[in-house]
Amino acid sequence: MANFTDAASLQQFDELLKNNSKSLTVVHFHAPWAPQCSQMNDVMAELAKEHKHTMFVKLEAEAVPEVSEKYEITSVPTFLFFKGGEKIDRLDGAHAPELTNKVQRLGSGGGGAVGAGDVPKEDLNQRLKRLINAAPCMLFMKGSPQEPRCGFSRQIIQILKDHNVQYSSFDILSDEEVRQGLKTYSNWPTYPQVYVSGELIGGLDIVKELVESGELENTFPKTVSLENRLKSLINKSPVMLFMKGNKEAAKCGFSRQILEIMNNTGVEYDTFDILEDEEVRQGLKTYSNWPTFPQLYVKGDLIGGLDIVKELLEGGELVSVLKGEN
């Protein structure tokens, strides 16, 4: 597709912004080792088919550091939105509904006249169907989970939180077409509206009834708390190394050094690539009160980072520590 391309250098990036200054340009800062980036590239490809007047660009964050540093890209996937060569918005993380909404909203206001070769605006029913299927559980509400903008939305957010329900949300106040269209599409006149697997569950009253009857647990997808997830990960193997990259390909010098040391001990260990999961990356810093990576754990207990491992190696204690003898 002419409007879905790659930028492999600073020069290419600048040229793409210059050549598409009259329309919206969406840049996906990605990494080939991150599965969520691959998923979002698929979303971008679909959006490119529907929004021919918008330019969609993939840029490998680590391959073009000049651009990544300029725009303070610290994790992938990250999306930047440009018009007239200037950044106008940003989206961090793999959030397909939010990306779709931003492309629709930011792209609709400009880009010059629509030419004869451009595709007509996406059919509303198709768009609504795609939105309600964007996640296993979708909540259409006023505002966001962080800032609900009506009492009913605030109540339903609290219920979902209390029952550890995993969901994505869409702010109907940001899109009047979706707000009005969904009422007719689902024959449900009020908000919030909750969907599971593309099927309407109902609004606040229905969700409250599910709570009272004890059926809510079996209706909604559950989420695991971050703390429980971290506990599970650090105990996944007797020796766990949280690093940038994996055994086959370390993605920073510190991780590469600790891999060499670990491989020379002959002790079996497992690894977790923190670059693939920002929630784990940030959560582990707080959970273990250790701000840097790599981090080494034995039987669920933090041993430390590269410096500690080097000290244990020099003191002749590393192998016994890894075997849980100390």
Curated annotation (Swiss-Prot):
Domain Glutaredoxin, chain residue ranges per copy: 125-227, 227-326
Subcellular location: Cytoplasm, Cytosol
InterPro entries documented for this protein: Glutaredoxin, GRX_PICOT-like, Monothiol_GRX-rel, Thioredoxin-like_sf, Thioredoxin_domain
Domain remark text: The thioredoxin domain lacks the two redox-active cysteines. This strongly suggests that it lacks thioredoxin activity.
Keywords carried by this UniProt record: Cytoplasm, Iron, Iron-sulfur, Metal-binding, Repeat
Pfam families, alphabetized: Glutaredoxin, Thioredoxin
Originating organism: Danio rerio (Zebrafish)
Name of this protein: Glutaredoxin 3
